Design a protein with these regions (language model features):
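A structural signal for multi-pass alpha-helical bundles of membrane permease subunits
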Residues: 5-7, 13-283
Length: 283
């Protein structure tokens, strides 16, 4: 009887967990639904308030965006170059840094680890002025480099990689590879990186999304129309003259801009559950 009651208690908790997860999922997806609904509505319809039923102006909104003065495809290309490069650079070098802290013993190891974590507490806005002055002195305005190279130093990505590495990479495996004559870079690229694929995929998604949606830093550096990213172009569209302002076009452009994010997520999402679970459990 007691075992039966215990089993029913587990089922009740599981059912409650599923209900909560379903509610959270609906709350997350409803905003995407509203976005796509609004992308199908005209300027006049949007002023009448919210409706859950799609309208018939999607093609009209897309035509207006496509034929407008804003270079959306060039903006998407710029965003893709920056976001993909940032994701690759950030995850690879953060994994390498985490491996150095994990696998090697040196005198200031703990101090270095603490210093890297302290950097996480510094907001981007605090260092923006100095960063902009440095970019101007190096004559790197309207260039991808200042938006990609700094992602090498990504404390949040490093911390996640270090925690994940602690759970899946025993030092005995590294020692065995060293005994077999493998060098440091061979161990890292052929043993560590394959083991870290779930964590790399998770952080690649997060870094890609963060870079893709970043408006603040690109707006400081990119001024030429052909170099601007999608968030800057969307902001330009929103700040247009009131008489020419069409919110339907804005919603359509936002909907257009999130498709690459959805594709990246669908491609790499299978790693998220495994990556988060293994990264958060020691041993």
């Amino acid at each position: 009887m007691e075992r039966k009651e215990k089993g029913m208690g587990i089922k009740a908790r599981r059912l409650l967990a599923y209900i909560v997860l379903i509610i959270i999922s609906i709350l997350c997806l409803v905003w995407f639904y509203i976005l796509f609904i609004n992308a199908t509505r005209s300027k006049g319809e949007l002023t009448q308030g919210f409706t859950a039923i799609p309208s018939t102006h999607a093609w009209e909104n897309w035509t207006n965006v496509y034929n407008g003065s804003i270079p959306i495809f060039r903006g998407m290309l710029n965003s893709l170059i920056i976001a993909l490069s940032s994701a690759a650079v950030s995850t690879y070098f953060s994994t390498m840094t985490a491996y150095a802290i994990h696998a090697y013993d040196f005198r200031i190891k703990n101090a270095v680890f603490t210093f890297i974590l302290m950097i996480m507490t510094i907001p981007t806005q605090v260092t923006a002025l100095g960063f902009l002055e440095l970019v101007q002195k190096m004559k790197l305005e309207d260039n991808y480099i200042p938006l990609i190279v700094p992602t090498i130093a990504a404390p949040v990505t490093f911390f996640y990689m270090k925690q994940y590495m602690d759970s899946v990479l025993p030092l005995s495996l590294i020692e065995a590879a060293r005994i077999d004559g493998a060098g440091a870079f061979r161990i890292f690229n052929q043993i560590v990186v394959p083991l870290m694929k779930p964590a790399i995929a998770v952080q690649a998604i997060f870094t890609f999304v963060s870079s893709w949606t970043n408006y603040f830093t690109p707006a400081l550096i990119l001024h030429e129309e052909k170099m601007k990213t999608l968030p800057i172009l969307i902001a330009q569209l929103r700040s247009a003259d009131f008489l020419k302002f069409d919110m339907g076009q804005v919603y359509m452009m936002i909907a257009f801009s999130i498709f690459p994010v959805i594709v990246i997520y669908l491609v790499l999402s299978k790693y998220i559950v495994g990556g988060v679970t293994l990264g958060g459990v020691k041993g």
